[in-house]
């Protein structure tokens, strides 16, 4: 029997909570009220594959990136005590989808937010060749204008023949986006290292009504000459987009400021 997919929620001063997937139909029926993200003027978002915190200097870089950042979308985030302390001290809630444990702390996507989500749907897809899982997380947050912002944090499958499994991982995300009427941010490490994968990703984004954030000076990490990390959006305006060059991971973090 396959393992049930769930998220772990980390909140300062509270026990770790296990969250099971929410159904997309909940998005149509209305979500509970909650405190909005502090986004009166700008919404600052950081997206970073943190490489399981294996390189020196990751924590100082993370702390600097976290300044005035309302949403931080991490991939390959391993729930070490250092990361959990940072997350709970700096953010209202941190939700992680454990993809697998190495060796004792789960690793997967983690979304850190300056407000508690009113909806949470963890997703996982197994790598067909390595039999390891990649994870994604859908969360929804109120923003100051009364709308609900959907945030999708993804680490896409890497090793597969063709794009069938790649597209299969995107399909349930598309269902979630289609059920949501407000603004959306879809971001993460898409492992889009082939022309087939980029085509599949672009078609998916187009079908979902999403635009791609463009970087004027593009220092995104690449494989076979193609960028791996992307940010897509709808219902928001991009004010600034940049990439920080760092040796603290094998990926460079993306930083975007939106106007809600």
Swiss-Prot record:
Gene Ontology MF annotations: catalytic activity
Keywords recorded for this protein, A-Z: Cytoplasm
Major localization listed first in the record, in broad terms: cytoplasm
One Pfam family linked to the record: Exo_endo_phos
Keyword Cytoplasm listed: yes
Keyword RNA-binding found: no
One cellular component term from this protein's GO annotations in UniProt: cytoplasm
Cell compartments where the protein resides: Cytoplasm
SUPFAM superfamilies hit by this protein: DNase I-like (SSF56219)
Listed NCBIfam families: PRK05421.1-1, PRK05421.1-2, PRK05421.1-3, PRK05421.1-4
Protein family per UniProt: Belongs to the UPF0294 family.
Protein name per the record: UPF0294 protein YPO1077/y3099/YP_2772
Protein species of origin: Yersinia pestis
Lineage: Bacteria, Pseudomonadati, Pseudomonadota, Gammaproteobacteria, Enterobacterales
